[in-house]
């Protein structure tokens, strides 16, 4: 385990641009989640599991992780990672991401 580099899919950036202002998302909370993912220590992963309900996905999203951002209700982040990169793929609500 070690610090990862963050990389963002075009879809993630598009989701963020489309929804952040309209839904009044607190981007500081998103930055905190991204920092926890990128830090990639046992402590930060435990915090993601405990406070943000991080879990692995199945089906079309198999091999990826998902967690909730802060206490924002239905605001999710989906990412995958390898030994050096955390690749943030999508962000949004359940009904947008899991159609």
Mark where each language-model region is.
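Basic, Lys/Arg-enriched alpha-helical interface segments
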Residues: 1-74, 81-87, 94-99
